[in-house]
Regions:
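Short, intrinsically disordered, charge-balanced linker/junction segments flanking boundaries
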Residues: 197-201
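Beta/alpha (TIM)-barrel catalytic core signal, keyed to glycine-rich beta->alpha loops juxtaposed to Asp/Glu
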Residues: 1-165, 169-172, 179-195
Length: 202
């Protein structure tokens, strides 16, 4: 939520200001691909390394990239489930963020009791990611970014729309269709009526 110049400037004054911790956005996509998600972002690998250099603990926000890492497409989800069938897809992102030794805490936006229970299972105790798992998650990030989805996390900052459109719902439906490979090319396509009905009715 800030630019890199401000980050670097504030860290350059650590000897004087003595930061107790710094909050950064860190997840397995933003680790090396932050600019592909948002051109204003900086890779978490750089942000974290700068904190480590100064022995400043990191507080992690957006470990699930606004929930997107808990809603992977079926193909990517299956790859993670094959490795750890009993664990949620979200737990992979939390384990990634929690593996780094200078992480003080990982923030989690929880809506339901099931989210809290999943987080407790993931962190009590935390099983750090192996090098092989880091490689798998990097590959997952690269594959995820190849899908032509819209980077919407349903924050609703774009609402209300002056034309009465539910912008997040439209974008999320589009993303779901892309992820499922269910995008009709035109109104003559075999599955057009079915896809249209799914969008309008659910």
């Amino acid at each position: 939520h800030g630019d890199i110049e401000v980050f670097d400037y504030l860290l350059s004054r650590h000897d004087e200001l003595k930061w107790d911790f710094v909050q950064i956005q860190l997840n397995y996509v933003d680790w090396r691909h932050a600019k592909e998600v948002n051109t204003r972002n900086t890779d978490a690998e750089y942000l974290y390394a700068e904190l480590v250099k100064r022995n400043i603990p990191a507080v992690i926000m957006e470990p699930l990239l606004g929930g997107r890492l808990s809603r992977l497409n079926d193909h990517l989800m299956a790859r993670l489930k094959q490795r750890r069938p009993q664990e949620s897809v979200a737990s992979w992102a939390f384990r990634f963020a929690g593996t780094f030794p200078d992480v003080l805490t990982v923030l989690s936006g929880m809506t339901y009791m099931e989210h809290l229970q999943d987080n407790l299972r993931t962190f009590s105790p935390l099983v750090p990611c192996t090098e092989e798992e880091f490689t798998l998650l990097e590959d997952t990030a690269q594959r995820m970014l190849q899908y032509p989805t819209v980077p919407c996390n349903d924050c609703k900052y774009c609402m209300p729309c002056p034309y009465g459109l539910d912008i997040p719902a439209i974008l999320l439906h589009y993303n779901r269709c892309i992820n499922e490979g269910n995008v009709p090319q035109n109104s003559q396509d075999e599955n057009y009526r079915e896809a249209r009905r799914a969008f309008l009715i659910g």
